[in-house]
């Protein structure tokens, strides 16, 4: 936002990004920059190029803060991973924007995602990530659920939902099997096949948590059935740095599954309240039904 002689003028996201780019590279010409939005459920990412530089701009947005998104944390995490070659490199952290390198390559297609050869690549990438030193940002799941509860549409609340929420807030969580740095939003839209290999993008929810929780999130997010889950676990546990006891890991994933389902349900409900977009109600409905939440 800026002020003119006639009053307040609100700048668009693209105008704000353009200003950030021109401050970062003051010798470039503003008119040479081309900016376009990138697809996603939050619509806060932009691609920018002037022919010489190719940049992804990720905005710090107020609704994202309510969901736990923090670009300063994401900046620190990506710098932490800079030697692993599994994530984009940070160009700069400037006010309101995280600027990243644009990675050439193609997003993984849905039909490619569950193929055996791809599962091997994905397992190798995730075991590499899960074997890194901790980020230093542990997942505060109860705090997250409590925060989301304050932001949902109160018109949708029912006594059964209140009882369910109290149960998750007060019940003991599964013990940690292996604490690791994790991505928490692994799906085909966030996986990029590049000339340098498979990479993960969109690290805004990355955290430190149990690998069982992370893999339960992977399975839920991608709607993998039992055979697909077992295929992946064989690949994951077969990696040199994979978790060795596949049976124990599978049990741990099952223990975490209700917690993951509820976390994702709450995310959809908050996004519905924020955006009014009915797609979030549709995405939430199967999870609501699994918990017996009806109107």
Locations of the language-model features?
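A general structural signal marking secondary-structure boundaries and capping sites
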Residues: 25, 126-134, 172, 222, ...
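Conserved N-terminal boundary motif of the eukaryotic protein kinase catalytic domain
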Residues: 28-36
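ATP-binding pocket architecture of kinase catalytic cores
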Residues: 36-138
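Start-of-helix signal in alpha-solenoid helical-repeat scaffolds, especially tetratricopeptide repeats
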Residues: 71, 251, 255-259
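ATP/Mg2+ or Mg2+-diphosphate-binding catalytic cores
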Residues: 5, 159, 266-295
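Active-site activation/catalytic loop segments of kinase-like enzymes and analogous catalytic loops
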Residues: 212-243, 258-275, 290
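Active-site acidic catalytic loop and adjacent metal/ATP-binding pocket
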Residues: 41-51, 55-57, 169-213, 227
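An alpha-helical support segment within catalytic cores of ATP-dependent transferases
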Residues: 12-29, 134-184, 194, 245, ...
């Amino acid at each position: 936002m800026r002020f003119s002689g006639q009053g307040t003028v609100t700048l668009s996201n693209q105008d704000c990004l353009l200003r950030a780019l021109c401050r970062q590279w003051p010798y470039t010409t503003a008119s040479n920059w081309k900016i376009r939005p990138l697809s996603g459920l939050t619509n806060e990412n932009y691609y920018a190029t002037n022919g010489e530089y190719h940049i992804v701009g990720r905005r710090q947005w107020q609704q994202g803060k309510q969901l736990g998104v923090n670009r300063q944390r994401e900046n620190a995490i990506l710098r932490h991973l800079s030697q692993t070659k599994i994530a984009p490199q940070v160009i700069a952290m400037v006010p309101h924007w995280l600027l990243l390198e644009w990675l050439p390559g193609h997003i993984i297609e849905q039909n490619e995602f569950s193929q055996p050869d791809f599962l091997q690549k994905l397992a190798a990438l995730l075991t590499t990530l899960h074997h890194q030193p901790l980020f230093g940002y542990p997942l505060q799941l109860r705090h997250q659920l409590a925060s989301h509860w304050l932001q949902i549409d109160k018109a949708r609340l029912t006594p059964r939902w209140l009882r369910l929420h109290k149960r998750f807030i007060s019940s003991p969580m599964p013990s940690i099997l292996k604490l690791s740095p994790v991505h928490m939003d692994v799906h085909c839209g966030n996986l990029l096949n590049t000339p340098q290999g498979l990479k993960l993008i969109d690290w805004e929810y990355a955290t430190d948590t149990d690998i069982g929780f992370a893999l339960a999130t992977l399975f839920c997010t991608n709607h993998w059935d039992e055979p697909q889950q077992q295929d992946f676990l064989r690949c994951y546990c077969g990696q040199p740095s994979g978790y060795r006891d596949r049976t124990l890991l599978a049990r741990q994933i099952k223990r975490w599954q209700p917690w993951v389902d509820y976390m994702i349900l709450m995310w959809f409900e908050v996004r519905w309240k924020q955006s009014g977009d009915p797609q979030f109600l549709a995405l939430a409905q199967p999870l609501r039904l699994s918990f017996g939440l009806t109107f």
